[in-house]
């Protein structure tokens, strides 16, 4: 318990967290790709944030 109070996790907990973060990052990456694909469609909320700056640059 002292290791957890000090903020130092045992190795097996770190491995579980890394594995979970990897799955979470893959899931977030997939969601990001879907959002980018959806931003190409005419939706004012998303296009205003993502493609608005790109159009101004061009």
Swiss-Prot record:
It comes from the Eukaryota. It is a single-pass membrane protein. The chain crosses the membrane at residues 17-37. Keywords: Membrane, Transmembrane, Transmembrane helix. It is found in: Membrane. GO terms for cellular component: membrane. This is Putative transcript Y 13 protein. It comes from Homo sapiens. The gene is TTTY13.
């Amino acid at each position: 318990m002292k290791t957890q109070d000090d903020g130092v996790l045992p190795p097996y907990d770190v491995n579980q967290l890394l594995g979970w973060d990897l799955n979470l990052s893959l899931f977030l990456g997939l969601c990001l790709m879907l959002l980018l694909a959806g931003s190409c469609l005419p939706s004012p909320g998303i296009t205003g944030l993502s493609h608005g700056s790109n159009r101004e640059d061009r």
